[in-house]
Amino acid sequence: TSNGVQADSGVVDADVLHSLQLTRAFGENDPLKIIGAAKVKELVWHEDAFAIGFNFGLLTSLVKLDMSVEKASGYRNGSFMASTNGMLLLEEVNMRNNRLARNGDNGNVATLDLSWQGRLKKLDVRGTGLTRVKLATGAPVVQLCLPDTIEELFLEYLTKLSDSGLILEGINNVRGYRYTNCPGIDGFAMLERLHQARLNGSGKLERFVLEIDREDDGTLLKKYYDYGTYTQTGAVDDRHSGLRGKLTLTKYLADEELEKYAARYPELTIKQPPYTMIEFDDSVADDANVSNLDNKTGYKFGNTYKMSGHVNAILSKRHRVLAKVTRMPTSRKVEIAGQQVEVNNPDGEMTYFPLHDESSNFYADAEDMNDCTVAKLDGSEGDWMMYEPFYWSKGINDYLNNKKYACYSSYPEDEMPPIPDATVLTLDAIKETQGGWLGERKIMSGKPTLMESYTTDKAYSVCKVDVSGYRRVRFPSVPGTGLIGSVFADAEGNILKSIVVPTIGLKFEAGMYLIADVPERATALHFSILNTAEFDCVVLSHSDKIEDMEPDWVANEEHLCAVVGSSVVGSKLRACITGASTTASMTWTDFHYYSQQRGMQQIDALMHSRIANLSYAKYGRRDMQEQCGAGQHNNNRTTGGTAEHGMTDTIGYEEASSINPNVTNSLIENSVHQYAWYREKDDYGGATVTQVNNICCLGYEDIYGHKYDMMDGVDLPNDTGNSGKWRIWMPDGSTRLVKGSVSSGIWITAVAHGKYMDVIPVGSVSGSSSTNYCDIYYISTASGRVVYRGNHGAYPYGGVSMSNASYGSSNTSTYIGSRLAFRGRLVRASSAVAFKAISEVA
């Protein structure tokens, strides 16, 4: 000691502990000195009452320090080391229950600073009363034991520390929490514990920092909104909260709510969910079998359906416009329905300017309609069209579970929503695998082994795919006539599971796909295909999300489609108000020709499906005649009855009569009420209705009923092996075939749907005017059929889903019309004045 007492001396062997006896050898004013301290590797000293002046900084070779005591004595409030900067080799420190576990400020602050100990592996300071522990950035700590008095829990860059190595006496005093790059620690789970303690009234958490990359429905943003955080320099910041990194929402948030959270979490990238998902429950006949999985409304949830998210974003971009062809497209020869016709390429151009959403009689060049420029809808200022924006979509059929799904994304064209991981196999790829394809065979279900399941049939083939290790598989199939189907087999060829599409209640066509869970021990799926059916692909997935069984997204291109049917004005077909009704009694060939000469086309099959699907997604039902009304029961309605109401949709009898029980009650075929109504307000703000002859659905006038719309870009060749198949021309000029029903006159109960969400009736089951799709499908299997859509008059079978493929291209009728459309380059004029000054070229 400083007073000359030599307690012990001698030569100590390396790596061998030597005991020093210091009983009554030093006092408070007699600091202890260890001669040769720089050579000490391990020090075990179960003492908490030594002199303040002991200089641990001399122990420069110390690797392990054990100064734990069984019970804290509370003898002194000093610190066990005045300086730790020289103890750079320290790896293990055990100060459990030792109240001297402090450094700096003579121990008056309950802080232990080990920020110089870059090799520290183990630290135990339980029972020490510490409120803060500082560790070296990147220290290889594998065990960290902290007291229940800790107020600042900072877990940063401790890459070796695991959950099992972090031992906390308690968390109720933690006021500040920081977590960064500790892969073995569940930092989010710790935050949840701290938050729950505060909710329970036992915790004191005030601020935190946590880097995340996770999915959430917005609950986290609300939960941690009121907490503070720390700046990058470590300063307290109570104006913002501490979530950082990336949060992908699973529920779409309104723009104003998103802005609020973005301001509170400035270092958190909040990504709206990539899509909104709609579910159709085909096990029920209710036309309103639709559920919005985004906001949990609709049939499945037993409440009123409300559109939201990406559907709302897509619909908000749609507007009525006036448009002019400003560059003629080139064209090519195409045979449609047996006729050689000129078809425009998508290299033309139309320039447009929006009309006010509250009234199409004004341009949308000011918010207040009183300040807007008057628009002329007589054709002198362009064609009256609907601007249909770009969006992403995909459909999923889960036939075996009686479900269909529709996914919508308003992401821009240059940002495709995430593509799920999946193995996709084409028929060619399957044929290239050993035993992958066996011609002139089919699988019969219900047999015990694979070999017993094969039967010869020239119309079919059997495909085999390896399903080992996968969770789900999607594969094309056939109706189960005679128990034909598919089987899962194990490595020995034993049948583990058979799948058959029942022919009773059939809502399926050959080539449509099934989705099935892969049974345990299954190594292969053997499935029957019809040789003349379209083969989409096989999808193998590890995902539990049904939407991941369709890995491809469809880019729905922006285009224009006429708000009203076509009218002859002079020598041209126009979309305009003439004071009379729309044009009829022309052949498909002539309607196509005059539309093409304008640099445009007729409405096509993709547009037909798009309008139907968006109406389902908007209203959560499929019976648009009840939703938006059926209109006047004739085919000679005066065009333009919806102009002064802009994009506002009409309502049907059910809603109108709930406002005014005295509205016209006129049933057509004892099924549907004719006319439509606008919901308005009287002078006192009360609800009232106004009856009109035209319907408005999705902003379109008479998009169903009144007159059929002939369609471009589709026919039914009905040649060998292709009976009932719709041939659809895609915008890039390619074609695809979709098998539809061959049962004419059925009330539609199912549609092809699939990736493109085709509203093409399938199966043989018939519904009614008030169930399922509430519309009828007509078809002829004679060669070269064109397709009409929407029906005529106000017949109960003629809604937004209705189509008619019974006639050839030469048929005419007073109840068959057309509707202009345009695919190509769209240019928005800089102003209404600039638009009016533009001259059309066709």
Model-derived segments and spans:
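GGW-centered surface loops in extracellular recognition modules
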Residues: 1, 273-387, 393-395, 600, ...
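Extracellular ligand-binding interfaces
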Residues: 2-7, 479-513
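LRR N-terminal entry segment and analogous cap-like coil->beta motifs
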Residues: 11-112
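Concave beta-strand-loop units of leucine-rich repeat
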Residues: 45-51, 66-76, 95-108, 119, ...
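A structural signal for leucine-rich repeat
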Residues: 56-57, 80-87, 105-107, 111-117, ...
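Short aromatic-cysteine micro-motif
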Residues: 375-383, 413-423, 547-703, 842
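Extracellular polysaccharide-targeting segments
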Residues: 426-456, 466-467, 498-499, 507-549
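C-terminal, surface-exposed recognition/capping segments
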Residues: 609, 630-675, 679, 687, ...
